[in-house]
């Protein structure tokens, strides 16, 4: 039996059930486990209530129960500088960013990893649902989790082989009900705590209200691509491609079909809308993405043109595509086998080869079958 007692694993503990079970399992396996609570955002509300304080209390309870030391580290400045300013800049450009992808790369597996190493860590572990495998040549591979409903490789697609070398994802081979069962049987007080959802720094707050605190909103015309004014928008940053809710337009022509956001014109401050879920302006034949990154060195060995599958939003199913990389592999054009709906600039494009996540980048633009740019951003 392997003696793990000399291997120190620092666990990123959020106070939730997933990371608590990670700490418990590693402790059971004999590792030298240390818990660390990351405070990335000051979420104190107008009544002085801070959810982070409650979460930290849960970390303390779990750590005491399983018998491990725990610390708290403040990454608010790093988060503001590396994640939140990016988030705001993208919204200023009329795009819809995914801060979780940046947070994982810059905070959880960079700032936190560096901090863990300063505590003598051999590895860090988190409650992410993903798997890491090393092949016979020493290359790290990022694989989907067993629980396809919880798989988080989409958010981990910007990690490097060097980062994965130091990472453990103990929940990768488990399904969520099993995780809760382990927590309950181990007597962990968080076994029935509800999962956190949405962007961490917004939490339960109203998104429109939150964004309005940081960026000035400028109302403007809401119109069809034929130039018919349908109403007024509250500010382009509040809308995303394919959005239906919150437009304030009834049916009308086309058998009372619902209206959707089909584009934005930043220079004229116009929000374009169209009727029908199947509206042709929502469907792309291809997209361009930049800031492309491969998880390991094997990515570039595939050549600049190859077949794979791609995912362009977290909850979407990945679809078959052909990719065409630029000479330095930093940009890519992706051709879809079948038209893809509501491709959104600013979101992450993530590439897969079967169960393996091979890398990803950020979507810049989408095009129809005639190579005309959609969304008019």
From Swiss-Prot:
The organism's lineage is: Bacteria, Bacillati, Bacillota, Bacilli, Lactobacillales
Q: Which family does it belong to?
A: Belongs to the MnmA/TRMU family.
Q: Which reaction does it catalyse?
A: S-sulfanyl-L-cysteinyl-[protein] + uridine(34) in tRNA + AH2 + ATP = 2-thiouridine(34) in tRNA + L-cysteinyl-[protein] + A + AMP + diphosphate + H(+)
Q: Where is this region: Interaction with target base in tRNA?
A: 98-100
Q: Look up the domain of life of the source.
A: Bacteria
Per the UniProt record, the site (Interaction with tRNA) maps to 128, 347
Q: What does this protein do?
A: Catalyzes the 2-thiolation of uridine at the wobble position (U34) of tRNA, leading to the formation of s(2)U34.
> What is this protein identified as?
tRNA-specific 2-thiouridylase MnmA
């Amino acid at each position: 039996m392997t003696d793990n007692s000399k291997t120190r694993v620092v666990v990123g503990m959020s106070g939730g059930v997933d990371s608590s079970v990670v700490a418990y399992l590693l402790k059971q396996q004999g590792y030298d486990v240390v818990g660390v609570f990351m405070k990335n955002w000051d979420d104190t509300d107008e009544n002085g209530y801070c959810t982070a304080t409650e979460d930290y209390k849960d970390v303390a309870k779990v750590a005491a129960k399983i018998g491990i030391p725990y610390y708290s580290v403040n990454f608010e400045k790093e988060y503001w500088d590396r994640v939140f300013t990016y988030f705001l800049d993208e919204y200023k450009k009329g795009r819809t960013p995914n801060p979780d992808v940046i947070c994982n790369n810059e905070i959880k597996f960079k700032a936190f990893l560096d901090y863990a190493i300063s505590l003598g860590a051999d590895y860090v572990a988190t409650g992410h649902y993903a798997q890491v495998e090393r092949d016979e040549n020493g290359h790290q591979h990022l694989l989907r989790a067993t629980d396809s409903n919880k798989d988080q490789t989409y958010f981990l697609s910007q990690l490097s082989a060097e980062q994965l070398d130091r990472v453990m994802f103990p929940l990768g081979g488990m399904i969520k009900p099993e995780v809760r069962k382990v927590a309950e049987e181990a007597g962990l007080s968080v076994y029935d705590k509800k999962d956190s959802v949405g962007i961490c720094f917004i939490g339960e707050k109203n998104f429109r209200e939150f964004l309005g605190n940081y960026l000035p909103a400028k109302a403007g015309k809401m119109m069809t691509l034929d130039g018919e004014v349908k109403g007024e928008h509250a500010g382009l940053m509040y809308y995303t491609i394919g959005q239906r809710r919150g437009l304030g337009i009834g049916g009308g022509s086309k058998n009372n079909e619902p209206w959707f956001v089909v584009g934005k014109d930043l220079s004229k401050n116009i929000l374009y809308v169209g009727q029908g879920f199947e509206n042709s302006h929502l469907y792309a034949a291809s997209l361009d993405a930049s800031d492309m990154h491969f998880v390991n060195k094997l990515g570039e060995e595939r050549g600049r043109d190859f077949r794979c599958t791609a995912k362009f939003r977290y909850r979407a199913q990945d679809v078959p595509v052909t990719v065409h990389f630029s000479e330095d592999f930093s940009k890519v054009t992706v051709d879809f086998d079948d038209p893809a709906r509501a491709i959104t600039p600013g979101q992450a494009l993530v590439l897969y080869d079967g169960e393996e996540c091979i890398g990803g980048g950020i979507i810049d633009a989408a095009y129809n079958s005639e190579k005309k740019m959609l969304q008019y951003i």
